[in-house]
Amino acid sequence: MNKTAIALLALLASSASLAATPWQKITQPVPGSAQSIGSFSNGCIVGADTLPIQSEHYQVMRTDQRRYFGHPDLVMFIQRLSSQVSNLGMGTVLIGDMGMPAGGRFNGGHASHQTGLDVDIFLQLPKTRWTSAQLLRPQALDLVSRDGKHVVSTLWKPEIFSLIKLAAQDKDVTRIFVNPAIKQQLCLDAGTDRDWLRKVRPWFQHRAHMHVRLRCPADSLECEDQPLPPPGDGCGAELQSWFAPPKPGTTKPEKKTPPPLPPSCQALLDEHVI
């Protein structure tokens, strides 16, 4: 399947319905020991933690949408990364969407973020903390040129390279999704220390933020991990294929019905949603 078709499928999956999903009716984490269940794009979470809104090292955006819940491992990762960034004097980490209180499907914007192991982080590190108004209506900084072939040189900063590298070097991180042009710039800037680049994967959009994904926790027995990324730094032919023009004859894929929920997630919905 070519990349245009994949992009259309991802769009359909992330915005299949603008109506509220049953998961949005669950307003508090489900009590219990933390368990990520199912896959990143078809799952849920029991025992989610709430990311503390107040921190000297990070700020949480769009708190009115209440998407600041996740597995305790995700909360600890955010605290760990933002502390590293702060100690290096790089600025304040801006946290976007994590997941809903019980995970599950969004009504739009995300196909994944369902098991409490995904977080979006802006690719800007303000030296001055944002106001409440800025956090509620954040202005994304598009780092990619209009033609999508490279980053905007005046906007690309060494601190952003370091932010992505620090995240990729974290032991719990398995993937970081960024725009292909951003991946390309990372490849150019990386020098000889390149092992971490394997985790950084090119993906559609992601022009102003990175999407960080953690591995399944060892004690979440119903959590489904993705296969590891292909060996190597991912800076060769695979990356260049993202810049090739779409093949002629691309057709819009049919809208697909979401797959059945994992039984444990369906049972959770049955118990907690009237």
Curated annotation (Swiss-Prot):
HAMAP family, alphabetized: MepA
EC number(s) stated in the UniProt entry for this protein: 3.4.24.-
Single annotated GO MF: serine-type endopeptidase activity
Bridged cysteine pairs (disulfide): 44-265, 187-235, 216-223
Function: Murein endopeptidase that cleaves the D-alanyl-meso-2,6-diamino-pimelyl amide bond that connects peptidoglycan strands. Likely plays a role in the removal of murein from the sacculus.
Top-rank taxon, per record: Bacteria
Location in the cell: Periplasm
Positions contributing to Zn(2+) 1 binding: 110, 113, 120, 211
Gene Ontology terms: cellular component: outer membrane-bounded periplasmic space
Ranges for region Disordered: 228-265
Keyword Signal set for record: yes
Name of the protein in question: Penicillin-insensitive murein endopeptidase
A biological process term (GO) from this entry: peptidoglycan metabolic process
Subunit structure of this chain's protein: Dimer.
One Pfam family named in its UniProt record: Peptidase_M74
Organism: Shigella boydii serotype 18 (strain CDC 3083-94 / BS512)
Cofactor: Zn(2+)
InterPro entries linked: Hedgehog_sig/DD-Pept_Zn-bd_sf (IPR009045), Peptidase_M74 (IPR005073)
Residues that bind Zn(2+) 2: 147, 150
Keyword set, alphabetical order: Disulfide bond, Hydrolase, Metal-binding, Metalloprotease, Periplasm, Protease, Signal, Zinc
Tagged with keyword Signal: yes
Signal peptide: 1-19
Main localization (coarse): periplasm
Family that this chain belongs to: Belongs to the peptidase M74 family.
SUPFAM superfamilies linked to this entry: Hedgehog/DD-peptidase
